[in-house]
Amino acid sequence: MGNDADAAVHRRFREARDYLLHNREDYATAYANFEWPRFTEFNWALDWFDQIAADPANESRYALWIVEEDGSQGRWTFPELSRRSSQVANWLRQRGVRRGDRLILMLGNQVELWETILAAAKLGAVIIPASTLLGPADLRDRVDRGDARHVVIRSADTEKFAEVPGDYTRIAVGEPVSGWHSFAAAYSADAAFSPDGPTGADDPLLLYFTSGTTAKPKLVQHTHVSYPVGHLSTMYWLGLEPGDVHLNISSPGWAKHAWSNVFAPWNAEATVFLYNYTRFDADALMAQLDRCGVTSFCAPPTVWRMLIQADLSALRKPPTKVVGAGEPLNPEVIEQVRKSWGVTIRDGFGQTETSVQIANTPGQPVKPGSMGRAVPGFRVVLLDPVSGEPSSEGEICLDLTHRPVGLMAGYADDDERTATAFAGGYYHTGDVGSIDENGYITYVGRTDDVFKASDYRISPFELESVLLEHPAVAEAAVVPSPDPIRLAVPKAYVVLAAGHEPSGETAESILRFCRQNLAPYKRIRRLQFADLPKTISGKIRRVELRGRENEAGERRQQGEYREEDFPGLKS
């Protein structure tokens, strides 16, 4: 594109962004009138990031701020990251990285991660984000199925690739490693970058290996618009504005990291703030929030649950924008934070395959237990699983007659799965929800997690929410357990909070609490104290727990408590 065309693309993106900023607390107007900017050619790193970096208003504004556990820190302005990423892009090009090449990026929260994301985008390369927790077997899968031609990793992780065959460029960040290119050499490259041609808006940019809860990871393909432009919806949910300092607790390699540590905050011209720690410490985290003036905070339910175990009042200057993501938050957590900080955690819902679809947006009433309403740019429909017709409860789907920009291109390795996901004119999320007369959607569960007990439909999430209100319960997962009379009954796997013993007395207390707070047909009738199996990204693998129950059949498992063990429960 020429200069005039480049300027027009930037202007259209900015107009859409500014419309959402202007109507940040006017949901009705934003939802009714927002229109996605749609492009034929678009490169977010060049057409947006480099352009805002050149804006005099951002000359001294920090794009990235990383604080280490020992108190050391690094801060980089928008112009600095623009220049450094162009150097990295030129250097990667010299190492053979070409448009369309797939590049595994496996780094921690360090500046080189963001530089490489921007550099790869400028080059038109396809990024395969990878967690530093992955081992050789997972990495072989990514190299093979991902057809990776280049890898950029920490020097400390190079040994993992000794067991990963393949003809790929090896680049190490950190100490020099024999046989690997040193990333540090990139900073000697020219800072003036020119692309080798235009970037198609639908060209691939990201390839995510999802941490599926039921099967082998899927390859979710995103384009140069589906995440960069699509995350305007995430920016709207977070409520970010220029000048905000945003902390999102998420590990590199997973989609949520790109959501809230790259695209959404930089779309808003906000600062991405990171606090690196080896072990979570609620008091230390709150001290950093205070010291660094964090204005916006996003965390998964596990972190929120650990935070409420601490003295929340120790935080003198709470963030004014707080959200929860990953899995729906339980109402009792939201209430405790509201009482201590005077702000309401706003839930949202999205997937690796999408940007945020449903959310409690700024300035709007929050319905306890609800994920919120469809965000601007998304037309959400709940489809009955039997009739396929719109219903007040059903699978959460996106209407493709108004296809949102923030939706994947498809599954790169599976045309059949892609066709299934986009069947019938809808994108099918595989999640079940219910909707009220005001459009608020409440999460019910994955389509394969919801089950029937005595012919009643049971939502694991609803029962888990009640369990988590008990002081002895840190985490919980509910699955169906085979029963000769009811066919299945709800069984809870429980991780205890610190200071509580896995005893019959504790089990009776939890079961009694559930009887007092659940309708009779929803009662948890069996309970077992155990660690919860999780995916590498932290999602509970209920499918594994269901498998244990099916294997045991009606036989009582070791360490399992049943309601009939406690005759006093009926009193």
What are these regions (language model features)?
Residues 59-62, 178, 188-209, 215-216, ...:
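Conserved pre-ATP/AMP-binding loop-to-beta segment of ANL
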Residues 68-71, 156-201, 557-558:
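ANL superfamily adenylate-forming
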Residues 74-79, 205-229:
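Conserved AMP-binding A3 loop
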Residues 82-87, 201, 220-241, 249, ...:
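Conserved structural elements of the adenylate-forming
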Residues 134-135, 141-142, 153-154, 297, ...:
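AMP-binding/adenylate-forming catalytic core of the ANL superfamily
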Residues 228-245, 252-295, 310-311:
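Conserved AMP-binding/adenylation subdomain of ANL enzymes
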Residues 267, 294-298, 308-367, 379, ...:
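Gly/Ser/Thr-rich phosphate-binding loop
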Residues 387-420, 458:
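Conserved ATP/PPi-binding loop(s) of AMP-dependent carboxylate-activating enzymes
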